[in-house]
Amino acid sequence: MRGSKPMTASALVLTTAWISLAASQALGATLTVKAGESIQAAVKRALPGDRIEVEPGLYKETVFIDKDGIELSGIVRGGQWPVLDGENKLNDGVLVSGHGVTIERLWVKRYKGNGIMTQGSNNYRIAYNVVEGPCFYAIFPQFGKNGLVTHNVAFGSEDAAIYVGMSDNVDVVHNQTYASIIGIESENSHDILIENNYVHDNVVGIATTMLPALPVKSSDRIIIRNNVVARNNMKNTAPPGAITAGAPPGLGILVLGTDHTTVEGNLIRDNDGVGVMVSETNFLVTTPDDRMDPFPDSTQVLRNVFLNNGSNPQGTLRDLLDIAGVK
């Protein structure tokens, strides 16, 4: 390769370590969980790098994964799924703190807090799941790096269906979200890609936000690209006092205080309030935070298709338009 340099001893050691780790994971055991058995019990037996396959059936439990390299994979057979049901009693469906974990092909429903959550987990993959409310967040990666959230269906959330919080380098691609307060949200995060999603029939379609009073004080380099953002006109039922309670229905894409945000190539249609709104944080949040810049800088809105937006703005959005003299 032109311009290449000999590998240093330290690089060779690191490369060898990665190869050894990959080989150990490839040789991991496969554990099978049958209907009536416990997924958590299988996680306890598993070693880092093992694969856990879950047969179709009903599982009423919370699954906590604190080991690295675990693959938790549902088996969908004849239209029958492995279903995790919180029965509106349990707080969380799947909680992950290990690195390199995969969660795929599970139907997760009726957890009061989060359907699938990673916290401090890096290099995770959340794919091909169905996460059904009522819940607060359907899919919630937080405090992690290098994540992939793809080909999921998430709906019925009391806040965001997919919520990427205080994270770096996460791709949210090829998902469908609906019937939630916000379809997809990136909060106080960096290098986030939101692409090729179908986001419809929420209060707000896609939001990238810079919120105060959080440990991460910046949000930068968010790309919202090639999504379909349609009919996000649902009545806002967020509880009083919640930040999202102030979000007016009909917002297609909201850029709230984040820097270097690119909104490009999206089809944005039939959102009654506005197709794309770029605003300082105070539009929704008035909590003071002297360590945070609430103003969005270097936003680009490029080559989007807008159809039939803005026909019935409501709430704070209508108030702003009235002040500006827009009828």
Task: Give a label for each model feature.
Residues 1-13:
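Bacterial N-terminal signal peptides that target proteins for export
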Residues 10-22:
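Bacterial N-terminal signal peptides
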Residues 39-45, 60-67, 117, 218, ...:
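Short, T/G/N/S-enriched strand-turn elements that build extracellular solenoid repeat scaffolds
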